[in-house]
């Protein structure tokens, strides 16, 4: 193979006549085209050689294979030059060479056998695994389906229901469960894996063990009548759960074709569906998200300086409310020692009880053992003073949004914490410069903005000021990785990146409602677009108090472009506060089920009079497409300002922030990726048109106008301000 080859396989033949073929492509032994063609060459060589009796396929350094090399999707989607055909790999290579081999092959699985890796393993005649190895077909997370025979072989090894569940949820299973299902034939410790696989392969050759072709097994398949029921149920669930996604149905169709028309027909159907989905917007969007998520930790001028993260062993949290207890939960789950400080015994006990409840919820769901529960809770210590802060490596302040209180806490922290200690705040809106203005060591101050519930939501917004040391950012990035959060580094401003971008979201909804659009129609359109809930339902969930406080921050910071409405204050006067009072834009029954609030029209009419606006007949019958655009284009506009001001490093970071912080649909690629699919000129012209009709709220910013004139994408680099430090 050439020196530029991306990965390879090596083959060693033992004195027992077993050829060990090892996949080598760090870090996860992904199946690049180079690896696949090298694997084929190794197989063909083993089949030709008279001294080779049997084959074992494995992966280097304790990982079988993490699956098809995702960077190769660009080659397949590009449409330039000669491209490898997935059908050729699935049928001509994996089926007709590997599975049809006249010498038995055994897969020796450790670490990972995911996607294409598991598909190669299933084409072997037996599989031996370690107990903790992860096996699965997660391709649907990328908007495609398994393309190397997975839709045909998995159902024949584990049964239809389990196979569909594994593919549609993309969740891997451990080796032990795989053995109980029949996906693997034996479980052994890592040190015995290769020798066991060698013996197994020879025993197949000697007919002491079955020589199984997975593709032709039928003993695990249900009867045709039962299979049809399973397919119908799976389709109904997929349409309900993923109404905007076609690839879930395509996966079910491929499996069904194999069951009804035979495995060869199923392989052809799988290849046909894979090829079509590969060029879909959904696939391109999800692959963008995949790479964008992995690039958030690359911060120019910070992570390229060669700094090594310092070891953080002990973390203190000030405030044991919902956020503080959630952050404490996330930390102790990752084996950090945590000191939780409160102002009195009552609040402290309540905070500890919340952490305990968070952990017990995991035990109840089967996600945590009682042993792990005891170990985790033992890492938590509750205190009422700062005495235990003298040896902490990091403090996270998580008290209410009160500037003077936070300033006092940071003054105390500077006195009691060691000089190396990071001083972090979980504020969601307050200027960090203001919080730290009373202390001397401002290079240690950083924002660690978690999203509620903090132990579940995947995003960590890391906020840097112009004083924050690069070492402190590197340290917090490392903590974020350790607690399994996706960190996004942003600059310091009102609302930072996520809340700043999305502050027009609810404002646009209220503006439309006051101009005659039915609020429930707005929520339906936005939910249908793919958001977890519409803006009015979201406002009820967070509560009117929080919504009003956040709105006032933005009115203060950006008075020229906020839509000032009395709708929420008027509703608050009559004790409507959202879901917590069972009455807001919706009314809630005792089971928290939402229904329309019959009094809402009255409040909208009052707010309309207060704002001096009237119903626009054009808006009363606004199509769903226009509702989506009038809600989200102002959000895109604000995101452009965030980029122009250097608050975000790159547009892809905003895509991840929107997906993980606000639930923007990942299958649309994130806010900026979606906006670029529509075009900067289109978004600019629509906003310009609306600004003439409905005021400055819709006025497109300079960055957007410039991109529209140039015909450039919003996410293209260049024209950004220097990142705010």
From Swiss-Prot:
InterPro entries named in the record: 3-OHacyl-CoA_DH_CS, 3-OHacyl-CoA_DH_NAD-bd, 3HC_DH_C, 6-PGluconate_DH-like_C_sf, ClpP/crotonase-like_dom_sf, Enoyl-CoA_hyd/isom_CS, Enoyl-CoA_hydra/iso, NAD(P)-bd_dom_sf
> PROSITE patterns from the xrefs?
3HCDH, ENOYL_COA_HYDRATASE
User: Is DNA-binding found in the keyword set?
Assistant: no
Please tell me one Gene Ontology term that the record gives under cellular component.
glyoxysome
User: Member of which family?
Assistant: In the N-terminal section; belongs to the enoyl-CoA hydratase/isomerase family.
Record's PANTHER family?
3-HYDROXYACYL-COA DEHYROGENASE, PEROXISOMAL FATTY ACID BETA-OXIDATION MULTIFUNCTIONAL PROTEIN MFP2
Per its record, how is this protein called by name?
Glyoxysomal fatty acid beta-oxidation multifunctional protein MFP-a
């Amino acid at each position: 193979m050439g020196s530029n080859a991306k990965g390879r396989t090596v083959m060693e033949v033992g004195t027992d006549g077993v050829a060990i073929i090892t996949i080598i492509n760090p870090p996860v032994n992904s199946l690049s085209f180079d690896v696949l063609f090298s694997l084929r060459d190794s197989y063909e060589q083993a089949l030709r050689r008279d001294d080779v009796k049997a084959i074992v396929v494995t992966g280097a350094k304790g990982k079988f294979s993490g699956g098809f090399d995702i960077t190769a999707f660009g080659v397949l989607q590009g449409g330039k030059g000669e491209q490898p055909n997935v059908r050729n790999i699935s049928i001509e290579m994996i089926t007709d060479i590997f599975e049809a081999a006249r010498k038995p092959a055994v897969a020796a699985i450790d670490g990972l056998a995911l996607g294409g890796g598991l598909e190669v393993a299933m084409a072997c005649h037996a599989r031996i695994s370690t107990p903790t190895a992860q096996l699965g077909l997660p391709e649907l997370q990328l908007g495609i389906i398994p393309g190397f025979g997975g839709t045909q072989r998995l159902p024949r090894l584990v049964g239809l229901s389990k196979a569909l569940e594994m593919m549609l949820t993309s969740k891997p299973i451990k080796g032990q469960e795989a053995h109980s299902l029949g996906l693997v034939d034996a479980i052994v410790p890592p040190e015995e894996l290769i020798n066991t696989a060698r013996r197994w392969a020879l025993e197949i050759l000697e007919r002491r063990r079955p020589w199984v072709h997975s593709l032709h097994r039928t003993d695990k398949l249900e009867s045709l009548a039962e299979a049809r029921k399973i397919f119908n149920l799976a389709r109904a669930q997929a349409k309900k759960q993923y109404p905007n996604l076609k690839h879930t149905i395509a996966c079910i169709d491929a499996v069904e074709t194999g069951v009804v028309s035979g495995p060869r027909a199923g392989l052809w159907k799988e290849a046909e569906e894979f090829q079509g989905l590969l060029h879909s917007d959904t696939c391109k969007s999800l692959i963008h998200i995949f790479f964008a998520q992995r690039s958030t930790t690359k911060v120019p001028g910070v992570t390229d300086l060669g700094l090594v993260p310092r070891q953080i062993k002990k973390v203190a949290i000030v405030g044991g409310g919902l956020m503080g207890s959630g952050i404490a939960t996330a930390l102790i789950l990752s084996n950090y020692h945590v000191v939780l400080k409160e102002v009195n015994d009552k609040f402290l006990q309540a905070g500890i009880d919340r952490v305990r409840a968070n952990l017990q919820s995991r035990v109840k769901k089967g996600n945590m053992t009682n042993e792990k529960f005891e170990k985790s809770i033992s890492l938590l210590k509750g205190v009422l003073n700062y005495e235990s802060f003298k040896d902490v490596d990091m403090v996270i302040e998580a008290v209410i949004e009160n500037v003077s209180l936070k300033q006092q806490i940071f003054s105390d922290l500077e006195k009691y914490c060691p000089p190396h200690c990071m001083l972090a705040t979980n504020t969601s809106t307050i200027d960090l410069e203001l919080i730290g203005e009373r202390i001397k060591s401002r290079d240690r101050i950083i924002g660690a903005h978690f999203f509620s519930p903090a132990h579940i939501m995947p995003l960590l917004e890391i906020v840097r000021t112009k004083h924050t040391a690069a070492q402190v950012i590197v340290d917090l990035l490392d903590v974020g990785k350790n607690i399994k959060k996706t960190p996004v580094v942003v600059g310091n401003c009102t609302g930072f990146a996520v809340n700043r971008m999305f502050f027009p979201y609810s404002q646009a909804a209220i503006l439309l409602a006051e101009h005659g659009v039915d609020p429930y129609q707005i929520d339906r359109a936005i939910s249908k677009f793919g958001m977890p809930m519409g803006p009015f339902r979201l406002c009820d969930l967070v509560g009117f108090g929080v919504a009003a406080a956040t709105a006032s921050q933005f009115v203060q910071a950006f008075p020229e472009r906020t839509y000032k409405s009395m709708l929420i204050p008027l509703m608050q006067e009559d004790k409507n506060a959202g879901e917590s009072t069972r009455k807001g834009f919706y009314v809630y029954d005792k089971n928290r089920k939402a229904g329309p609030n019959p009094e809402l029209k009255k409040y909208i009419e009052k707010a309309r009079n207060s704002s001096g606006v009237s119903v626009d007949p054009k808006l009363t019958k606004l199509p769903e497409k226009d509702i989506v655009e009038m809600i989200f284009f102002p959000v895109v506009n604000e995101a452009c300002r965030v980029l122009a001001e250097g608050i975000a490093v790159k547009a892809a970071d905003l895509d991840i922030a929107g997906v993980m912080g606000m639930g923007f649909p990942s299958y649309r690629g994130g806010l900026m990726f979606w906006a670029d699919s529509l075009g900067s000129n289109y978004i600019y012209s629509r906003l310009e048109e609306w600004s003439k009709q409905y005021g400055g709220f819709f006025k497109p910013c300079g960055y957007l106008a410039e991109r529209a004139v140039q015909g450039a994408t919003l996410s293209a680099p260049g024209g950004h301000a220097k990142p705010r430090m």
